[in-house]
């Protein structure tokens, strides 16, 4: 995709101290850029391939192996083996060759950083607009949204309390009482859904055993549930 000259000085301002004008690209002249900024030309192995190529292109002394060709960010590897050798030297990979380097370049196609110039061998084109966008750090709200989504997924999944399927109920009498209390109050106990609570018949039997006198009902609220649970504790041990 051919980019207009308006987007290209943005990248040059980011990585090169001597930006060029729009007319330079429109006229198809060869850019005469200065050396890359110190942050790019440190020579560390952390440099990315696209930065390395810009570093070579910034120095006309490298025209024997790589050079700008025309405008619109197009360049050509005049000696692809030499470019690959230098890239391997920078990354401490002595087995680097053009086949491996070209595979790395293809990674940039999907990122809209670079594209292959069809019909020209060893010719590529920088997409400066896509490269500038790729260099933008993700917004802070994106990290917050990702964290919130992960927390919501964990809560929905019950990951904090879920037990393996097929596990027999543990011999802990308090859990059966807890289920009975929750069932009487109409609330499911969070985190202990693995143990089913008593059915309605059992709850009615517990109430009748505690309050045999007609018209006498358990007190409202959790106190009645506690009383019923205490009385029926032996039935669920």
Curated annotation (Swiss-Prot):
Pfam families: Ets. It comes from the Eukaryota. Residues 129-237 are annotated as: May mediate active transcriptional repression. PROSITE patterns: ETS_DOMAIN_1 (PS00345), ETS_DOMAIN_2 (PS00346), ETS_DOMAIN_3 (PS50061). One of its GO terms (biological process) is neuron fate specification. SUPFAM superfamilies: Winged helix' DNA-binding domain. Gene3D superfamilies: Winged helix-like DNA-binding domain superfamily/Winged helix DNA-binding domain (1.10.10.10). Specifically expressed in central serotonergic neurons. Also expressed in adrenal gland and to a lower extent in small intestine and eye. GO terms for molecular function: DNA-binding transcription activator activity, RNA polymerase II-specific; DNA-binding transcription factor activity; DNA-binding transcription factor activity, RNA polymerase II-specific; double-stranded DNA binding; RNA polymerase II cis-regulatory region sequence-specific DNA binding; sequence-specific double-stranded DNA binding. Transmembrane segments: none annotated. Belongs to the ETS family. This is Protein FEV.
